[in-house]
Amino acid sequence: MAAAVLANKVAKLESPKVFVDSAGTSNWHVGQGPNPPSKRTWEKAGYSFDHIASQFNYSRLVAADLVLVMDKDNHMEVSRYVTSEEEERKIYYLREFDTSGPDSLEVPDPYSLPDSAFESVLEMVEKATDGLIEQLLI
């Protein structure tokens, strides 16, 4: 969901040019399309995004300028690939960019929960991606 929201928002920017990629930290859903409730939620909010699940790896860390994680488990898994301070400095919790001062830096995983949980996550993601874009434009 975060990739869908961010990709749609940065597509409207003339500069800087931003490439949005998404990968899971496990191989559970590799090759599959988006989770139906997640896709339904972002489409209802006006976002479009095509996605096939893939797994994060060291090459992606090296290629990225910024790696956004959703929770502590994601952070731990992504950090396993870090071989330098430069690579470590690329990793941020998405909600670090939420200027409303969230109670937690973690975005909960709504998988297997009702649509209302996906809508709550969408709201968190929208706030955080707005803050991220503000930072990109500085």
Model region roles, listed by residue range:
Residues 1-138:
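Short polar/charged helix/loop
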